[in-house]
C-alpha cells in the first residue's frame, strides 16, 4: 500500500450510485497517490510544510476490470490547479490542484469527450499530446483545431455553393420575366417581328390577288395561239408566255411536245365547238339582218 504524498493531500471516500462520475471543481491544493486501488486515510491537515505539486492520474481504459483499478501519481511541480473528483464503483476520489490539460487527457482517454468550457489556445504541450495518443485504447480522433478548421472550410464552401445557386436562379428569373410569351410559351422579339411582317405581306398579297381576280373577271381570257375564249375550253393552261395563256388543247400540245398544234388540222375541233357558240352566232346573224333592213329603209326614204 502506497502512502499519500504531501501533507496537504487528502482523499474523501463516500458511497455513490453511479459507476463512474467525474467532477471538476475549484478548490485548494491537494494531492494523492494510490497504486493498488485501496484507500489510505492517513492525511495530515495541520502540517503546512508538505508538498503541493500537481497530480497526473492514469485511469485504465477498461473500467469493468475490478482487479486493474490502479492509479499513479506523478509530481509535475507547484502549479495552481483545480479540484478533480472521481467516483468509481461506490468510491469517490478527490484530487486537488489538477491542471486542465490532465483532465482533458483523462477525458479523451476514457471516451473522447471534451471539456465543457472553452479551453485556452495553448491547451496541452506536444509532449503530453504524444503521450496521450500513444496510450492503448485511445480513440483515433482529429484534434480540436483541425476539426474546427475543417468545419469552417465546409461551411464556407457550402455558403459559396448556395450563393452561386441563388445568383443563378435570380438571373434566370429576371431573364424569364423580361422575355415575351405567347400562350405561356417563350417567344423572341425577332419571331414576333417576322410574324407581323409576314402577316402584313400576306394581307397585301391577298388584297392584290383579290384586285387581280376582280379585274380578270371583267376581262375574258382567250388562247394566244388559237384565240378560243376561256369559256369555250375546259381549262386554261400554261404556255411560253406564262400561266393561263393557252387553251386546253394548245396547252397540252405545248406541255407534251414543246410545240404548238397545227390550226389547219383543227377543223373538227372547231366543228365540235360550234354547238357551244350556236346561240351567239344566231344573235350575230339577227343583228346583221336588222342592220341591213335599217340601211335599206334609209336609202328608200331618200
Swiss-Prot record:
Q: Does Transmembrane count among this protein's keywords?
A: no
- Polar residues composition bias: which ranges? 126-141
Q: Name one GO cellular component term.
A: nucleus
Pfam families, sorted: CCT (PF06203), GATA (PF00320), tify (PF06200)
Which PROSITE patterns does the UniProt entry name for this protein?
CCT (PS51017), GATA_ZN_FINGER_1 (PS00344), GATA_ZN_FINGER_2 (PS50114), TIFY (PS51320)
Please give the residue ranges the record annotates as the region Disordered.
47-66, 119-141
List locations, semicolon-separated. Nucleus
Q: Where is the Tify domain?
A: 77-112
Q: Carries keyword Nucleus? A: yes
What the entry lists under InterPro entries is as follows: CCT_domain, TIFY-like, Tify_dom, Znf_GATA, Znf_NHR/GATA
The domain of life is Eukaryota
Zinc fingers classed as GATA-type: ranges: 217-273
Span of domain CCT: 147-189
**Key words, A-Z:** Activator, DNA-binding, Metal-binding, Nucleus, Transcription, Transcription regulation, Zinc, Zinc-finger
Extract one GO BP annotation from the record: regulation of DNA-templated transcription
Q: Name one GO molecular function term.
A: zinc ion binding
Q: Give the family from UniProt.
A: Belongs to the type IV zinc-finger family. Class C subfamily.
**What name is this protein filed under?**
GATA transcription factor 28
Q: Which organism is it from?
A: Arabidopsis thaliana (Mouse-ear cress)
User: What lineage is on file?
Assistant: Eukaryota, Viridiplantae, Streptophyta, Embryophyta, Tracheophyta
